[in-house]
Amino acid sequence: QTTNGLDIGTGTGLLSLMLAQKDPDAVIDAVELGTDAAQQARENFAASPWKERLNIFNADILSFKTEKSYDFIISNPPFFEDDLRSPDETKNNAKHDTSLSLNELVRVAQQILAADGSFAVLLPYQRVNYFTEEAGRQGLHLAQQVLVKQTEKHNYFRGILFFNRKKTQPVTASINIKDKEGNYTPEFVAALKD
């Protein structure tokens, strides 16, 4: 059975390619505002063995029209909402929350997510609580979160959040990318395989 996926702000398409490889039933629509990034994603998709299941749309997700409801939605939105901005607007759109606010991202996901679908987002750790609260206000509830550290000694710097429409007790996991010796941890390697 085909599952419909949506990658909001796909960039060069890496996450879409990974999902297509992992799920042989997934048909993925990837939406990217930036023309250059969308073109690179188009080329990456065309060169992949999953090209028949990957669609790229050079569009703003706020004006993206679809009749589909999506079984899964993923997004890795811009990270540097409050940091110094570049004079280069392309870099700003790639690195800053300039073209799609986190509130708008939740609203879009809520509107087109299937009733039993899931929405996954990768965020800077300092945005995790805000995003979780905003998603809850809009009817998407945290099911699972994976909090990421560089090493055990570091603070969390990323959160991988999974939402759905059902209220449940969220599951929280923590992962360190590297161990004390600077090697990738087995947990991180296993997570990359998943």
What do the predicted segments below correspond to?
Residues 77-104:
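Mobile active-site "lid"/loop adjacent to the S-adenosyl-L-methionine
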Residues 50, 136-139, 171:
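Short, structurally constrained coil/turn elements
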